[in-house]
Amino acid sequence: MHEMSVALAVVDQVAEAATRAGSITAVRSVRLQVGELAGVVPDALAFSFELACAGTLLEGAELVTETVPGRARCTPCAHEWAVGMPPRLICPLCDGTHTELLAGRELQIVDVRWEDGHKHSPTHAPTREPISEER
């Protein structure tokens, strides 16, 4: 179950961002984009996230996941389509097999809401560019 390692990585990244921001008293929610082709089971990730948050600044935080549908483009005819699950990577228009995956492999933190000890109001974590493996 690799969802636990994903959850631990998310908790580590959010905790690190909270430390850099300073005076963060609690994390309220974490929003993730999860591509339908990323190989992540949302229910298993939610369960793992709850366990990974225990005893940290994120304890009790809500995990919100947004599913990104898989999309592909045929190189020869430029047709784009939703690949579905299991993924259909043969072009439905021309039966071409030279396809490019456009979306569906995402696994990234989109937004974090936390409590700032000084302001007592939710703030957002700084955004970051996804690494190449996340695109």
Where does each model-flagged region fall?
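Long, charged N-terminal interaction/targeting segments
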Residues: M1-A61
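Extended interfacial segments that mediate partner engagement and assembly in macromolecular machines
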Residues: H2-Q13, V40-P42, L58-V64, P87, ...
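Short loop/turn motifs enriched for small/polar and acidic residues
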Residues: V30-L37, E66-G70, V110-V112
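Short, intrinsically disordered, charge-biased short linear motifs at domain edges
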Residues: E59-T65, T75-A82
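Residues immediately within or flanking Cys/His clusters that coordinate Zn2+
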Residues: R71, R88
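Short cysteine-rich clusters marking metal-coordination/redox-active sites
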Residues: C74-C77, C91-C94
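Short functional micro-motifs and their immediate structural scaffolds
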Residues: A82, G96-E100
